[in-house]
Amino acid sequence: MAHHPETDLYRCKQCTHAFSHLEAMREFEQYEDNYFDVEHRRWFDHPNTALFARIAKAIPPGASVLDAGCGRGDFLRYLTEHRPDLRLSGIDLSSNQSVDGIRFLQGDIMQTGIHECFDAIVSLTVIEHISDVTGFVQRIHDLINPGGIAIMMTNNEGSLLYSLARAGYHLGVPLAFNRLYSRHHLHHFTRESFRMALRRGGFSIESDFVHAPPLAAIDIPVQGKIADAVLRGGAWILFKVGAVTGRNHLQTIVGRAVALPQFDVGSC
């Protein structure tokens, strides 16, 4: 694939999965205090409540739920209002202020000792930041009760937005390309490679769908209201076309945990 200012990019010819040169990127994958408040302020100021509502409908009544990589806890806060029957927990590298009805844990889900299992685990825009995708999905599988569900969301590298960004790079306009393949995204999943990752980790695919983020949530790295409005209008058109063609920017999978005898040690 093309060269990024911060790393080299590669693509698997079999599963179409794109990924960064992981060793070279390891030093970049650090999250400063301004990750939520400055660098991606719009994304976190405009939560995807339409997606939250769709996910909430997929969670069984009375379920215990873990949000893996919960960030500021926006999804869990949504559930406290709309699904008060659920038992809610969240884990993230960053600390969170206490909220009634939510138990927050601070740490790396791959290393933190969690001595219980859950009926549903949700993980939104996290897997693309994890170097060991297989280990992450298997860790989620280990923390789910038999027959429980995992709901994961990530970018869709097969989307129209990604395609235009790659075309722009080859035409000498790399702004969108450099943004989408940023240093914080180690993996770039197509729909095929995302499904494959969950199947390999012990999940059958219940459903999957593509969708767009809220237009107001897009971080557009330009100065000036006119330039911002033009690019945001272009994104709106892309998202509308993506909805019709099935090539929208985000993808979500609902998977059900199935038995994996080779991974039984330490699982629920």
Label the predicted regions:
Residues 6-7, 131-140, 149-259:
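S-adenosyl-L-methionine-dependent methyltransferase catalytic module, highlighting the catalytic core
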Residues 144:
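Amphipathic alpha-helical interface segments
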Residues 63, 147-148:
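Surface-exposed loop/turn positions
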